[in-house]
Amino acid sequence: MMYNAPLDDMRFALNHVVDLPGVTSAIGKEDSISPDLVDAILEEAGKLATGVIATTNRDGDVSGARRNDDGTVTTPPGFADAYKAMAEGGWTAMDAEEEFGGQAMPMVVSSMVNEIWQSSNMAFALCHLLTQGQIYALQKAASPEQQAVFIPPMVEGRWTGTMNLTEPQAGTDLAAIRTKAVREDDHYRITGQKIYITYGEHDMAENIVHLVLARTPDAPAGVKGISVFIVPKFLVNEDGSLGERNDVHCVSLEKKLGIKGSPTAVLAYGESGGAIGYLVGEENKGLEIMFGMMNHARFAVGLQGLAVSERAYQQALYYAHDRKQGTPLGREDGDTIIHHPDVLRLLATMKSEITAMRALAALGGGALDLAHADPDQEDRAALLIPIIKGWLTERSLGLTSQAVQVHGGMGFIEDTGIAQHYRDARILPIYEGTTAIQANDLVFRKTIRDKGASMTALLDEIAGEASALTGHDDAVVARAAAAMTDAVG
């Protein structure tokens, strides 16, 4: 069963959940970004997703990425061509600033497009997700010279980006990082090992730009001594052409439960003298810089939770309309399971929760846009990110499980394909910060820091919506209003 972008549901979120004209006006783009343009963007993204990207999803899960004897990595069939199609269509340029060749599209719009990519093939779309995050980080923290060299090729889709944090002894505890960076003239020599590096090596782009956390020799202990470095796979000549291979290599790929089409690499830095890296910002300020990229990635992972749930729902709905099981009284032929009450319950639950997930994601995208234009709005956006990442990813586990349940015994058989979505979803509450990390972030960083002002404002907004719906003529709406009122106290 092929994927079709839920364009009507996306239009509903943009028109009735988020004030799209208000957002575009706030960021000074009301004249250049019209509703008709946004509609056309979503339609064209849907065509590319259905016709090209989604066709690679099953093969990616079955064949997976493969490391070759020379250390190169071959991605599944169709992945490289699909990424080329994205680049040629200008889709890799959506988020970047115009000065770097980007389109500076509002986040509330680009997040809808990213949902489409992630639904069509989550393992494939991870490459674009991390590249977007690195572009965002470099736009904020890199020097003008670094920006000029590294951002435009990623915007064009010729290069891709990664985020290198984790080491065997340093997962959530980044204070345990041991990768070293020793200054040498205008650059640093990087030595160490990084693990769980998504698209750390692949064949979809000319170059890979790694953003690496490391320590200088005299760095303070703990997280206060972490710096961040740009380490390209191939060094870049003064004219922008690619030079010699840098001293960073893929030594193995992880064998995973899900997202098997994405190469998750173990990278070795400095086996032949040290990889050349370039300091971003100041020494010992790396974690602050990387958090900018991580927040972008956490929002994007929340979108993945929505996306995989949507894909699983579509497949479950198709199966329920197609599968005949049981014969109603008075009929000789069987009936499709869409008429079974419990199947209807499962599908209705999935649809309603996915609608809520998309609404929350749209609110988050709009909040990020407003924060980009007005620093006073940053607290609201920051508050929503751990909520989006935590709730959307946790619910994706339940919703993809329900999609398997709709299939009955066939859901447990890999040939149907529905199990892939269940397996793919399992990583989402883990990477880019576990759900427990999101909870800590929400309480200790996002709530306590302003003495609960942002959270109180959000709860008051929810209470106001509930109050406006109290006593509504529609009994379902009235019950929802009562539940909202109870939830916010």
State each model region's role.
Residues M1-A125, V149:
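Amphipathic, small/basic residue-rich leader segments at the start of a protein or domain
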Residues L130-T131, A142-T179, R183-D186, Q193, ...:
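Internal maturation/activation junctions in enzymes
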Residues R183, I259, D379-L459:
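Alpha-helix capping/hinge segments and adjacent helical runs
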Residues Y196-T198, L235-V251, K256, P263-A297, ...:
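A glycine-rich, basic-preceded beta-loop-alpha segment at the flavin cofactor/substrate interface
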Residues R298-A371, K451-G489:
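Extended amphipathic alpha-helical segments enriched in small hydrophobics
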